[in-house]
């Protein structure tokens, strides 16, 4: 990746993080930690990887994206706003009654949402179904789904993984946001799903493990996934929960807590300073 592209992605990711904090603060509820950890992944997907058109969000030939860890919708919404699906002003109305952006993705109410999600474990099943439909219809689109590391404790994840492998869904790419923390504590202590890579390999997936905040690594992983034949792919992205906001990083308490006014102002100052530094390069 050239330096100009990388700089632009970092700048956009900083704006996505600002949007996450803005939305969750105004809603007085939501899930900032996992949204921030996935911000770089959302950014790369919507600005480099996905074949999409914000002016034609229902294009039958578009790539599909399913946010299986639907509670991290603030990150997805912030990326969609930056990509032009709707105004960034909508982020300030997150979770408001009747607003476009609800607490979990709603495919009927929000442009750019391919699947309603939030019940953990179900998104991957929907994504696998979309991928199979693409095969049946002889379509070239690809399907992507972002899962949480705590989410993969759900049995339905592995039923869908078995289905995807059995049907040779090489047009399906999963991303696991492995930030190591879930609502009840460290993932390793709650159910201990590791080694995740070996599990997916046993289920017939092509597996890569990367730094989920390194755009060069993200680019290389998605490029490789598109070369894989006759099997689905999974990218295990090692990330930092709360990435970008110093007091939120690696703190389980920020899984599903909104910042108060003082915390909001601190977060916005940090993220704005980071953005200005990037824009000054």
Outline where the language-model segments fall.
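N-terminal hydrophobic or amphipathic helices/low-complexity stretches enriched
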Residues: 1-16
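N-terminal capping segment at the start of a domain
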Residues: 13-29, 177-179
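Cofactor-binding active-site loop characterized by glycine-rich and histidine/acidic residues
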Residues: 20-24, 35-159, 165-166
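Structured core elements
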Residues: 66, 173, 209, 234-236
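Glycine-rich beta-alpha junction loops
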Residues: 71-72, 76, 179-180, 214, ...
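Short acidic, glycine/serine/threonine-rich loops at helix termini
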Residues: 77-78, 106, 156-158, 184-188, ...
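Thiamine diphosphate
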Residues: 112, 116-119, 124-227
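Glycine/aspartate-rich loop-and-adjacent alpha/beta segment that forms the canonical ThDP
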Residues: 215-281
